[in-house]
Amino acid sequence: MRTKYCGNIRIIDLHKSVILCGWVHKIRNFSQFIFIDMRDWTGIVQLVFEKKNNKVFTKAVNLKNESCIQVIGIVKKRNANNNNLDTGEIEILVNKIKVFNISKNLPLDYSNNSNDDIRLKYRYLDLRRSELLENLKIRNKITHLIRIFMENKNFLDIETPFLTKSTPEGARDYLVPSRNYPGNFYALPQSPQLFKQILMISGIDKYYQIVKCFRDEDLRSDRQPEFTQIDIEASFVSSTKIRNLVETLIKKIWLKVINYNLNKFPKISFYDSMKRYGSDKPDLRNPMEIVDISDIVIEEKVASFFQINLKKKNRIALLCFGQGNKISQKKIDEYSNYVKKFGAKKLFYIKINKIENRFQDIQSSIKNILDKNTLENILRKTNAKNGNILFLLADEEKIVNKSLGMLRIKLGNDFIFFKKNTWKPVWIVDFPMFKQNSDGKFSSNHHPFTALKKNNQNKLEKNPNLAISDSYDLVINGYEIGGGSVRIHDAKIQKKVFNIIGIEKQFQREKFGFLIEALKYGPPPHAGIALGLDRIVMLLTNTNNIRDVIAFPKTTSANCLMTDSPSKLKKSILNELGINILKK
């Protein structure tokens, strides 16, 4: 049907006859000549229709953008090159044309980003954009690289079930009713976590899978209800071994896809990350760090001014921003209101005009409560310079960390004082085993199958809130790319963890009985990780929305506008499944 792809024709093909298939991208009618940019998935080539060839010229006149055609023609040299096209040195003089289908008038405009809902409804048209097509090609390249890498490391690609048991894993499950067992439901997996652990118990030494996962949760620009995970698990390995494997894989992907050499990934503990960056997902391109000055500004002396409750675990800390000369009082007020969203009472500042003059040339909302010695110590600890501004908070530790962490991100976005096209991966390790809710109850920080860090066994018994897990997240430029851990491989410890997070024994048997039973038959030590493929592709294609790297994504309300799903079912089908819909 064709002898060449549109984007592959070059000057070396001059005077050759070619057969091309594709879509009408753009039409320009000059009375005696019609020029058409023809497109397929490799690129664009210019077609020329001469009026003296009346048969093909007449057909060309009636064409519309996005009509699907086949042409036969001779490769000619252009009078003037088009340097914007790979095929810009040549054009095709058409002598035959076959019209497969004329397109309707388009509901979207390719020249600009049309309404998102329109783009998703007509996704088959949206996917004809070169940008989206290129994203899917890059996605394909990444998955190909992953498979080759994992095969070379002797990992087995093993599929795990999509119809499985509903287990509490944090988010809500998507449920599938069983026709054969009325009133019973399968769940679509949020991850293959339990199955991959069972595979390790089964003696499968190394497993991986590029797999769809499902979570019925509120969406945002980097989340979808169905997403793709690079799932990895191995027996008789440490957390270091898994991190080294993944680091090698990520470095290979970045090198092969965008020709970028990543440096060795630093490792930061969860507690250090929260203290230094106010986040467990720090963007290390931003050089600012939170500086603790609790040792300089005595809490008891300033408690009244800062409205600190001395009975709580407090922190006094600040950010040193280098472009203070760009920060107006209006901007300071804006940032003060911004941090209130995260529980902060008031944002204080110290603006340094001439550091040589110390106290005289400093503007500050707390100048009256700082003596010269305290101020000197603050300037010394922050290494502040002329033109810097210090943003200071004093409050509960969690509030200070969160508020200054978010302010750090906002300052980075507002002033972009770091290189955008650089990459800063980091491992965040040693997360707390549990989170304690406001009612005092515990929940798992990662998931309840995460193993304790060495020498934390006693804490599990006596102080669960102090227990540290052998866990790790990979963060790149502020995005969490993946998370993993060493797994519990002792049935007794697994039961203890379930007890701590409030899963009753009966519920343990119902939901996790198969795992606990399997853990009684000589399970090996094992560890693993899950990486978000969609987020990796999103980063490498420099897109802001995960929808742009998925062929058929959902909206932020989990709708597919193209197929109009989810949709209602006939009463007869619901009756067969034993389902009665209650009206809200």
From Swiss-Prot:
<dbReference type="InterPro" id="IPR029351">
    <property type="entry name" value="GAD_dom"/>
</dbReference>
<dbReference type="GO" id="GO:0003676">
    <property type="term" value="F:nucleic acid binding"/>
</dbReference>
<dbReference type="InterPro" id="IPR004365">
    <property type="entry name" value="NA-bd_OB_tRNA"/>
</dbReference>
<keyword id="KW-0648">Protein biosynthesis</keyword>
<feature type="binding site">
    <location>
        <position position="224"/>
    </location>
    <ligand>
        <name>ATP</name>
    </ligand>
</feature>
<dbReference type="InterPro" id="IPR047089">
    <property type="entry name" value="Asp-tRNA-ligase_1_N"/>
</dbReference>
<dbReference type="InterPro" id="IPR012340">
    <property type="entry name" value="NA-bd_OB-fold"/>
</dbReference>
<dbReference type="InterPro" id="IPR045864">
    <property type="entry name" value="aa-tRNA-synth_II/BPL/LPL"/>
</dbReference>
<comment type="function">
    <text>Catalyzes the attachment of L-aspartate to tRNA(Asp) in a two-step reaction: L-aspartate is first activated by ATP to form Asp-AMP and then transferred to the acceptor end of tRNA(Asp).</text>
</comment>
<dbReference type="Pfam" id="PF02938">
    <property type="entry name" value="GAD"/>
</dbReference>
<keyword id="KW-0436">Ligase</keyword>
<dbReference type="GO" id="GO:0006422">
    <property type="term" value="P:aspartyl-tRNA aminoacylation"/>
</dbReference>
<dbReference type="InterPro" id="IPR047090">
    <property type="entry name" value="AspRS_core"/>
</dbReference>
<dbReference type="InterPro" id="IPR004115">
    <property type="entry name" value="GAD-like_sf"/>
</dbReference>
<dbReference type="GO" id="GO:0005524">
    <property type="term" value="F:ATP binding"/>
</dbReference>
<feature type="binding site">
    <location>
        <begin position="532"/>
        <end position="535"/>
    </location>
    <ligand>
        <name>ATP</name>
    </ligand>
</feature>
<keyword id="KW-0067">ATP-binding</keyword>
<dbReference type="InterPro" id="IPR002312">
    <property type="entry name" value="Asp/Asn-tRNA-synth_IIb"/>
</dbReference>
<dbReference type="GO" id="GO:0005737">
    <property type="term" value="C:cytoplasm"/>
</dbReference>
<comment type="subunit">
    <text>Homodimer.</text>
</comment>
<dbReference type="Pfam" id="PF01336">
    <property type="entry name" value="tRNA_anti-codon"/>
</dbReference>
<feature type="binding site">
    <location>
        <position position="215"/>
    </location>
    <ligand>
        <name>L-aspartate</name>
    </ligand>
</feature>
<dbReference type="InterPro" id="IPR006195">
    <property type="entry name" value="aa-tRNA-synth_II"/>
</dbReference>
<feature type="binding site">
    <location>
        <position position="446"/>
    </location>
    <ligand>
        <name>L-aspartate</name>
    </ligand>
</feature>
<comment type="similarity">
    <text>Belongs to the class-II aminoacyl-tRNA synthetase family. Type 1 subfamily.</text>
</comment>
<keyword id="KW-0963">Cytoplasm</keyword>
<feature type="binding site">
    <location>
        <position position="487"/>
    </location>
    <ligand>
        <name>L-aspartate</name>
    </ligand>
</feature>
<feature type="region of interest" description="Aspartate">
    <location>
        <begin position="193"/>
        <end position="196"/>
    </location>
</feature>
<dbReference type="GO" id="GO:0004815">
    <property type="term" value="F:aspartate-tRNA ligase activity"/>
</dbReference>
<dbReference type="InterPro" id="IPR004524">
    <property type="entry name" value="Asp-tRNA-ligase_1"/>
</dbReference>
<dbReference type="Pfam" id="PF00152">
    <property type="entry name" value="tRNA-synt_2"/>
</dbReference>
<feature type="binding site">
    <location>
        <position position="169"/>
    </location>
    <ligand>
        <name>L-aspartate</name>
    </ligand>
</feature>
<feature type="binding site">
    <location>
        <begin position="215"/>
        <end position="217"/>
    </location>
    <ligand>
        <name>ATP</name>
    </ligand>
</feature>
<keyword id="KW-0030">Aminoacyl-tRNA synthetase</keyword>
<feature type="binding site">
    <location>
        <position position="480"/>
    </location>
    <ligand>
        <name>ATP</name>
    </ligand>
</feature>
<dbReference type="InterPro" id="IPR004364">
    <property type="entry name" value="Aa-tRNA-synt_II"/>
</dbReference>
<protein>
    <recommendedName>
        <fullName>Aspartate--tRNA ligase</fullName>
        <ecNumber>6.1.1.12</ecNumber>
    </recommendedName>
</protein>
<keyword id="KW-0547">Nucleotide-binding</keyword>
